[in-house]
């Protein structure tokens, strides 16, 4: 995980401690990993070395998952690779959530295989209520998405690598980046 992410997570932990709230998220839950995950191409580039270091068999398995998910998304008219911050995003999120597709990076134990470089959308999302609620809807009242910090980090990323700005649906981003 990058230093910026670590700083943000420490700040979130301090807020939780100060307000005496406990995040109910835990390793292996993975309900939120069935929501639409959008990321910048810069975040995608941070993931690339992890993919490149996989064994040939693991890379092929990931490639099959990515291509299968892209196909399912296209069949369900989720063809937009870039997500905009508009009403259209909510419609796409709803359609995606109903598909109940697990993130391509979830391993057999329902843990994130790229945890150290997971997208900002993933590390900035925390649930403080019943974990079962995350199975029912992508917009859970007891969750907090620490958007402000996420946006600050995202701005840094965009400044560092301005070409191809925007947010991409994870399977499409990986497919494009890996040229699959």
Each language-model region and where it sits:
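Short loop/turn segments that flank or connect secondary-structure elements
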Residues: 1-180
């Amino acid at each position: 995980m990058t230093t910026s992410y670590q700083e943000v997570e420490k700040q979130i932990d301090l807020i939780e401690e100060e307000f005496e709230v406990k995040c109910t998220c835990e390793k292996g839950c993975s309900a939120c990993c069935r929501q639409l995950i959008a990321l910048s191409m810069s975040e995608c580039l941070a993931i690339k070395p992890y993919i490149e270091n996989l064994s040939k068999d693991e890379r092929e398995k990931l490639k099959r998952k990515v291509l299968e998910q892209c196909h399912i998304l296209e069949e369900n008219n989720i063809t937009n690779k870039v997500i905009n911050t508009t009403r259209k995003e909510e419609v796409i999120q709803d359609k995606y959530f109903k598909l109940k597709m697990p993130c391509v990076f979830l391993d057999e134990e329902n843990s994130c295989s790229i945890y150290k470089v997971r997208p900002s959308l993933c590390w900035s999302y925390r649930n403080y209520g019943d974990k079962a609620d995350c199975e029912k809807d992508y917009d859970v009242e007891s969750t907090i998405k620490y958007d402000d910090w996420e946006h600050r980090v995202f701005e840094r990323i965009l400044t560092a690598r301005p070409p191809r700005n925007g947010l991409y649906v994870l399977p499409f981003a990986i497919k494009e980046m890996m040229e699959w």
